[in-house]
Amino acid sequence: MATPLGWSQGGSGSVCLAFDQLRDVIESQEELIHQLRNVMVLQDENFVSKEEFQEVEKKLVDEKAAHAKTKALLAKEEEKLQFALGEVEVLSKQLEKEKMAFEKALSSVKSRVLQESSKKDQLITKCNEIESHIIKQEDILNGKENEIKELQQVISQQRQSFRNHMSDFRIQKQQETYMAQVLDQKHKKTSGTRRARSRQCSREK
């Protein structure tokens, strides 16, 4: 029979890893918001059109909303994990006490069986009830462990979804930057052509 306290220590390590993953997601979102702000400032300095500025501003607002929603959801999942871990810890301690009581009772039963054969059946029945109760407690602990694993899987899926979203957003930003460079080069080329024509007209006059 596995020792619940040993299991609890391993479970805590897994949960700590899950919490680190949550923090990574939040930090990534905050970094994205910071980058969007920098993009807005840079575009403002380069005389970006009002439509482009409003589009970037809207994206920033949307990212802030998504960040807040994700942060709230992760906080809720973290609360569930903490609650589940608290229950596991309480049940583990209770199970340990009951196991000690069971071992003590079993030792007492063995001594009394030798001394009081008439009470043997009654004492054995009591021990069986205690053992059955311990088995039920272990089943509850296993259920809590499965619940924690499911919560960790949800967190992992949310993190992967966020990474995919960030990848799509970066690709979009690269495309927008490329288009802006093309338009800027085209604008400079058009301006140079107009100046050349203007000088030629002045010479002809």
UniProtKB/Swiss-Prot annotation:
Looking at the UniProt record for this protein, which Gene Ontology cellular component terms does it annotate, in alphabetical order? cytoplasm; cytosol; male germ cell nucleus; nucleolus; nucleoplasm; nucleus
Pfam families recorded: SPATA24
InterPro entries reported in the protein's UniProt record: SPATA24
Superkingdom of origin organism: Eukaryota
Keywords associated with the record: Coiled coil, Cytoplasm, Developmental protein, Differentiation, DNA-binding, Nucleus, Spermatogenesis, Transcription, Transcription regulation
Q: Where is the composition biased (Basic residues)?
A: 186-205
Region described as Required for interaction with CBX5 and TBPL1: 138-185
| UniProt keyword Nucleotide-binding present | no
Q: Keyword Transferase, does the record have it?
A: no
Offer an example of a GO molecular function term for this protein: DNA binding
Tissue occurrence? Highly expressed in the testis and is mainly localized in the spermatids. Also expressed in the lung, heart, spleen and epididymis.
What's the protein here called?
Spermatogenesis-associated protein 24
